[in-house]
Amino acid sequence: MHTLPLLFRHSLRTGAGFAKSTSPNHVSTTSFVVKLAPPRQRSRLGYVDASICLRCQFRAQTRFYSVQGDGGGSGKENKEGGSLEGGNPTSSTDAKRDQTSSPDSSSALKSSDKSQAEESKDGPESRKEDSEAETGGSLPSHWESRRSHLSKQFSQLMDNLQSNIFIANRHLNDLTGYSAIEALKKNIVAQEEHVRQTRTRVREAKDAYSAAINRRSASQREVNELLQRKHAWTPTDLERFTSLYRSDHANERAETEAQDALMAAEREAEEAAGLLSKSILSRYHEEQIWSDKIRRMSTWGTWGLMGVNVLLFLIFQVAVEPWRRKRLVKGFEEKVMEAIEKENGAQKEHAELEGKPAVEVTPPAVQTQRLTEELASEDQGENIPTFTSAAPSDLSSQEMQPGLPIQPEIEPEPEPEPEPEPIVEPPLTTILPPEASLSPDSWQQTFRDLFSERRVTLSQRDLTTVALESAAAGAAVMGVLIAIFRPR
């Protein structure tokens, strides 16, 4: 008898399905289809399909081998349907019943096998991607790619920044009118080149005219020489005289044409030079207008900045500084009140522990008010009698002990209260020193006092007045300077 794994190896074949025979006691059975996984998946799948009842598989395998060994049985292998028909009627009827439910189970097993195959195919790729994601963040190539990406972004940003700056500069030149001046500059450069060309043509025309004059003069001189020895002419001299006489008209016409060309070249050069000078003057005029416009804009911008500074100064001095001062005073008062409350609470706790009444600490504002009231009452000459009352703790102790004799109350001698020191406000001092004499020492001392570290106390009104006077003086000085140095 074969062992169980050997039976599995002999029985489980690719694409073969077997009908599971059951005992008569079972009501219904389900057929199963066992498919061998590909060689790549056998290591993963193992005996996944062998999880069906081993007893049923063992019975099917033994029946299969008994039929094959005897050779006379009526069972045969149905390769298309993937089932076996046995010789006994019970197995055939069970196989027929199982064929009705076999398509559903076989389709389910096929779908599960397909999903497992897809998972086995996708498994290495997903694991590879996961490993790359885990190790890719720390590899030098990853950092290099990120650095190159950042450098590309930075270079693109710089290129865009340069183009944006160029476009903004061009729009600013269009608004201020400097673009027209640039066009004038280019036109002047072209006109200068044209003037150079005209001057070159003038020189060439002069050379041609001089050559024509020399050629005609030479011919006339030769004619005169021939006329002087007219009585001794030879046939060659006669032919030469006739040729010179005929060419004299052509030389005269060439001289006239060279003279006309020279005059035209000189006229064109003069026109080009005049146009160039006009362009230079117009450029100078436009540049002066542009500089005046820029100077005017800078002046108004300076005035605007001065106005903004003065406005901010006034806002800070009128609104922000008082608010900040109030906030500081409020915070200081809150801290003082908290300290006083803590001190009163500590004194009350100490008095409760000792059985004595607590002495409350009055705030400084109440103390000053009481001192002023006492001073006013002393000035009026009113003597207000003072009565001292027994402490509540003493009264309660006497009431609780009725057997003890009640001692008469002894009024303590009033201690002389110290006279409150009058609150003297610091005198307001001016920013500028007092009027000094005209001596150099006094002026030197005054100048040093202006930059000394002497503390000055002044009111808000004086500070605002000084600020406004300074702003007005600066505006007046700037107006005078602009009126003096402004170009006419």
From Swiss-Prot:
Residues 101-110 have a biased composition (Low complexity). Residues 66-299, 486-488 are mitochondrial matrix. Residues 111-130, 343-357 have a biased composition (Basic and acidic residues). Residues 1-65 form a transit peptide. Residues 179-212, 250-279 form a coiled coil. Residues 410-422 have a biased composition (Acidic residues). It comes from the Eukaryota. Residues 383-400 have a biased composition (Polar residues). It is found in: Mitochondrion inner membrane. Signal peptide: none annotated. Residues 321-464 are mitochondrial intermembrane. Disulfide bonds: none annotated. The chain crosses the membrane at residues 300-320, 465-485. One of its GO terms (biological process) is inner mitochondrial membrane organization. Keywords: Coiled coil, Membrane, Mitochondrion, Mitochondrion inner membrane, Transit peptide, Transmembrane, Transmembrane helix. Residues 66-147, 343-423 are annotated as: Disordered. It is a multi-pass membrane protein. Required for the maintenance of the structure of the mitochondrial inner membrane. Involved in mitochondrial morphology. Causes growth arrest when highly overexpressed. This is Sensitive to high expression protein 9 homolog, mitochondrial. The gene is SHE9.
